[in-house]
Amino acid sequence: MITVVGGTFSKLHKGHKALLEKAIETGNEIVIGLTSDEYVKRNKVYPAIPYKERYRNLYNYMVKKTNKFRIRPIDDRNGNAPYERDYEIIVVSPETYQRSLKINEIRIQNGLPPLKIIRVPYVLAEDLFPISSTRIINGEIDGNGRRLKPVKVAIATNNSAKLKATNDFFHKLMKNFDVIQNTDYKLETQQPFGEVTMNMATKRAMQSLGDNDYAIGIESGIVYERFSRKYFDFHYCVVIDRFGNVTRGSSSGFEVPDRIIDLIKRDMSFSQAYGKVIDTNGIDDSTGIVGKISNGRVRRYDLIMECIRNAFIPRFDPDFYDTTYTPP
C-alpha cells in the first residue's frame, strides 16, 4: 500500500521534514506529490523556485532516509489522491487537513475507500508562529525557525511593571525581539469591574497591533465571586498576533476588603481607595498594593508576569487549541 504526501517544498524546512518523517514511519511506499511550476505561479505569493530544484532537494533528503519513495508532479491541490486505489494513508499539516477531508469525500463518491489521515502538528519557529517557505523566502526566519528579523511586540501601557514584565517574559522565549511601548490609548474607566476588565485589556491590545507581530493589553480589575460573596483583584492579559489570533490569560486573584470596594464604587481607583486605608507612599509599579499588604511576598510584577504567561499557554500548543494561521 501507499502513503501519500503533497506540497510545494519551496524551501525544505523542519515542518516539511516532520511530514516526510511521519510518512516514512508508516512503513508504506511513499508517493510525494510535488506541485508543478505552473501551480506555484498560480497559487503562491513568492517567486517560483523551479520544479527541478525543488525535486532535487526533496530527492536528496529522502534518499538518505528510505528507498521506498517516488516523486511525481501534481498540478492542483488534490493531485491524484482522490482517484488512486492503492493509496492508503495521507499525511497532512494543519493547513491541509481540511483539504484531506475533501479528498476523502471525492474518493467515496468515486467508490474508493477513504484514506487514513495522519495530521502532523505545527512546527513552530522561535517566534511561536509556524515555519513556512514564505517566511523563509521573505528573510524572516531560517529553515530551522530561528528569527532573523526582530519580533515586534507592542504593549499599550504607561506602567513600568507591565513594560518590564513583557520584556522579561519574551527574553525567556527568544533572543531577537523588540518591545514597543504604546502610550497613545484610551481608557473607559480608572477602575474596571468584571467583564469591563477583559474588554479594556482587549482594546489596549487592539489599539497597539498595527504592523507588529504581537500586541499585548493588560488590565487589572475587580471580579465578584458569588460563592464567597467576595471581590477579588485579577490581572487580565489579551494577546493578539498578526494573524488575528487572540489568546487570553489571568493572574491569581486576591481578596479585596469590602470597605475598599465601597470606596472604588464611589469612582475611586484601586490605588486611591487603598490610599484612604493604608499608607501607599513609596509603593512603586512593580511592588503594587499587593506587595504592601503581603509584606513583599507577592508583587504586582509577579501577577502581571503570571497573566502574560497564561495568555501564551495556547500558543505553545496551537494544535490542541485548533489554532489556524491565515495570513492577514
Swiss-Prot record:
GO terms for biological process, alphabetical: coenzyme A biosynthetic process; nucleotide metabolic process; thiamine metabolic process
Region annotation (Inosine/xanthosine triphosphatase) ranges: 153-328
Bound cofactor: record note: Binds 1 divalent metal cation per subunit; can use either Mg(2+) or Mn(2+).
Pathway: Cofactor biosynthesis; coenzyme A biosynthesis
Reaction(s) this enzyme catalyzes, per UniProt: (R)-4'-phosphopantetheine + ATP + H(+) = 3'-dephospho-CoA + diphosphate; XTP + H2O = XDP + phosphate + H(+); ITP + H2O = IDP + phosphate + H(+)
A Pfam family recorded for this sequence: CTP_transf_like
Subcellular location: Cytoplasm
Record Gene3D superfamilies: 3.90.950.10, HUPs
Keyword Lipoprotein listed: no
Domain of life: Archaea
EC number: 2.7.7.3, 3.6.1.73
Cofactor(s), names only, from the UniProt record: Mg(2+); Mn(2+)
Swiss-Prot/TrEMBL keywords: ATP-binding, Coenzyme A biosynthesis, Cytoplasm, Hydrolase, Magnesium, Manganese, Metal-binding, Multifunctional enzyme, Nucleotide metabolism, Nucleotide-binding, Nucleotidyltransferase, Transferase
Region feature (Phosphopantetheine adenylyltransferase): 1-152
Molecular functions (GO terms): ATP binding; ITPase activity; metal ion binding; pantetheine-phosphate adenylyltransferase activity; ribonucleoside triphosphate phosphatase activity
The keyword ATP-binding is assigned to this record: yes
A cellular-component GO term for this protein: cytoplasm
Free-text function comment from the UniProt entry: Reversibly transfers an adenylyl group from ATP to 4'-phosphopantetheine, yielding dephospho-CoA (dPCoA) and pyrophosphate. Phosphatase that hydrolyzes non-canonical purine nucleotides such as XTP and ITP to their respective diphosphate derivatives. Probably excludes non-canonical purines from DNA/RNA precursor pool, thus preventing their incorporation into DNA/RNA and avoiding chromosomal lesions.
Family as reported in the entry's similarity comment: In the N-terminal section; belongs to the eukaryotic CoaD family. In the C-terminal section; belongs to the YjjX NTPase family.
Entry protein name: Bifunctional phosphopantetheine adenylyltransferase/NTP phosphatase
Source taxonomy: Archaea, Methanobacteriati, Thermoplasmatota, Thermoplasmata, Thermoplasmatales
